[in-house]
Amino acid sequence: MSAGEGWCVATVPFLETDQQLGRCVALIGTDSGRYPYGNSLMVSGPEETVLIDPSLAIAERGGAPRHIDRMLISHAHEDHTAGVSTFPHASVHSHHDDLLALHSLEGYLQVYGMPEEMAAEWGPKVVEEFNYAPRLDATGFADGHTFDLGGGQRVEVVHLPGHTRGHSGFLIEPDGVFFVADVDLSAFGPYYGDHWSDLEDFERAIERCRTIDAKHYVTFHHKGIVHGRQDFLTQLDAFAAVISKREQRLLAYLSEPRTVEEMISHRIVYRPNVEMLFVTHVERVSINHHLRRMCRVGSVVELESGTYRAA
């Protein structure tokens, strides 16, 4: 490891798992970026270098292979900001809608929208296990904003809400790299289980991803790098199909009257053996997203407050 110059954070060696994509380097996290780790993207131009989504793996490496001038955060979730405190002198930016989470822990917890008792337990975990520290100097960006790194190298914000209100991807040109963040193409499927999530916004975000023509697509989790538009679209179709599969499972379960609590215990998002602090919260939020839509289109009816059945 070599020391950085001036106030720079120390630079660290490249790893064999790091993958070069033009002037971009995908810094692949532990176990292909499986949660709680993730795949960060470093983009260098003649004038500055930015790091997109500094992950827990970056924090454990103790820095990045180049001096980082700026950090771009796709959205306010603990695994995407775990390396922010590693670069205290780099500026940090997120979409305006998620910016409050970078300013305070209270703002961070507001994005999740957990019940008070759960938030009291989750908050310390975000600090202790994901290195959270407020960045009052963090500033916001909007859809279409472009960060100019010099020499024609640029990073454009692509707002992809649904996962959170501010969730954004980044299109890097002229390399043709599209960082899609948590449109992660995983078998788990789309996550819309927080207070600031929205199922139908997520579906629209998926459709917007289809319109972006790139050479390489980088996910924060699991897949890492997908080369070529056709392969990306095939995997995106499978990812999106998980939403309808969840809805069909829920509809089948509602062949007889069920309460929301029964649906939560039955689960449509997590497998029955998964035990994590936030599972019940995620199931509740996700199921309510589906119920609202199913009631609106008439496939489900509410018999009495909190009890539903397939129409």
Give the ranges of each region predicted by the language model.
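Metallo-beta-lactamase
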Residues: 49, 146, 154-242, 260
